[in-house]
């Protein structure tokens, strides 16, 4: 007797009417059921889904389970989630969150991403830790973010939503960039993309002025905001609207001009802003204690012209990270046992969704 015929998998085609069959050689194998995981607590919400802390009942490993949100979808998995899954499956770096596998619930539209678990996120730590990070610890964190970004950018991926709440840290001090719901692969030449990305406080000026040509430089602006936030112990540019955000940038860096940012006046939304006349760069006034190397790095990250903005590789070579206080080793980063996500809901299987609120550390 020959081998049995493989079960047919038929998928609905979104762009054309009808269905198509997935050939057996293109299948990755059956996904495990989410019932094989024990839910411990809900720990947050990413761009496109709820995140749980859970235990793999087969291996006892603690993982993060991200439930893919299907709120507005009628024809299957949201394209944003497909992008995130596709990107994460090909990314392997110590400073990028790991997608271990995809598991399914009771219904076809119930999908979970099994991610490597990190004990805390930087946003919660900044809100709750009694003593702010030292400069040596800030350098340790930012170096790890830069290494992860260098890997992403070398693989032609823009994260597009870097912020402290998307930076996770393990109890070994390893920092990992997470939440790739807005990430995009890009090519050369760069294709147009929507400017409505990146959380407002971390949004580069070219995005605020409506550019559709997005490059890795938008991630680097966000790194500058993160570095400044970690050093100052508060957000650098906490705008309440896009107009306010632009004004805060001008107050900090001075008014942009064609001399320092060629093509700036031709950006789609440039004519809609009435920019205050402010000729001074106030970074040194904002960080009077920061070394010349630190200010130089920050200025390179906050260049108005995206083409002149520092790359992740440039930053990794910065003398700021080679002067005292030197970056501490990740293993020597402080631990925060009282800020970890502990069991906040009854332990159950993940067949049903909890209504508990985010368990703040």
UniProtKB/Swiss-Prot annotation:
Region (Disordered): 332-361
Residues binding ATP: 43-51, 66
Record's subunit section: Heterodimer with CCNQ, the interaction is required for kinase activity. Interacts with ETS2. Interacts with PRK2.
The organism's taxonomic lineage, starting at the top: Eukaryota, Metazoa, Chordata, Craniata, Vertebrata
Protein name: Cyclin-dependent kinase 10
Active site residues of this protein: 161
CDD domains on file: STKc_CDK10 (cd07845)
GO molecular function, one term: protein serine kinase activity
Subcellular locations according to the entry: Cytoplasm, Cytoskeleton, Cilium basal body
Catalytic activity: L-seryl-[protein] + ATP = O-phospho-L-seryl-[protein] + ADP + H(+); L-threonyl-[protein] + ATP = O-phospho-L-threonyl-[protein] + ADP + H(+)
């Amino acid at each position: 007797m020959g081998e049995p015929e493989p079960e047919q998998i038929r998928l609905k085609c979104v762009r054309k009417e009808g269905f198509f069959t997935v050939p057996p050689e293109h299948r990755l194998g059956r996904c495990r059921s989410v019932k094989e995981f024990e839910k411990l607590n809900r720990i947050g919400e990413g761009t496109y889904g709820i995140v749980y802390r859970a235990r793999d009942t087969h291996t006892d490993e603690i993982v993060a389970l991200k439930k893919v949100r299907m709120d507005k979808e009628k024809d299957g998995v949201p394209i944003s989630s497909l992008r995130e899954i596709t990107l994460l499956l090909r990314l392997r770096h110590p400073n990028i969150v790991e997608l271990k596998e995809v598991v399914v619930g009771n219904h076809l539209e119930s999908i979970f991403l099994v991610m490597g678990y990190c004990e805390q996120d930087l946003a919660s730590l900044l809100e709750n830790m009694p003593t702010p990070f030292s400069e040596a610890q800030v350098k340790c964190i930012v170096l790890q973010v830069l290494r992860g970004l260098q890997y992403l950018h070398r693989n032609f991926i823009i994260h597009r939503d870097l912020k402290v709440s998307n930076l996770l840290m393990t109890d070994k001090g390893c920092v990992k960039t997470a939440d790739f719901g807005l990430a995009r692969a890009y090519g050369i030449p760069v294709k147009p993309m929507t400017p409505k990305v990146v959380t407002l406080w971390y949004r580069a000026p070219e995005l605020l002025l409506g550019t559709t040509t997005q490059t890795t430089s938008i991630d680097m602006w966000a790194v500058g905001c993160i570095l400044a936030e970690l050093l100052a112990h508060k957000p650098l540019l906490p705008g309440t609207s896009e107009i306010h955000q632009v004004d805060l940038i001008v107050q900090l860096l001075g008014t942009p001009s064609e001399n320092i940012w060629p093509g700036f006046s031709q950006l789609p939304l440039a004519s809609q802003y009435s920019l205050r006349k402010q000729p001074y760069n106030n970074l040194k006034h904002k960080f009077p204690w920061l070394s010349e190397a630190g200010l130089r790095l920050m200025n390179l990250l906050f260049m108005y012209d995206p083409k002149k903005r520092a790359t992740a590789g440039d930053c990794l070579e910065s003398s700021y990270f080679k002067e005292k206080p030197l970056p501490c080793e990740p293993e020597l980063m402080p631990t925060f046992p009282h800020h970890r996500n502990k069991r906040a809901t009854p332990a159950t299987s993940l067949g049903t969704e909890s209504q508990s609120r985010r368990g703040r550390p």
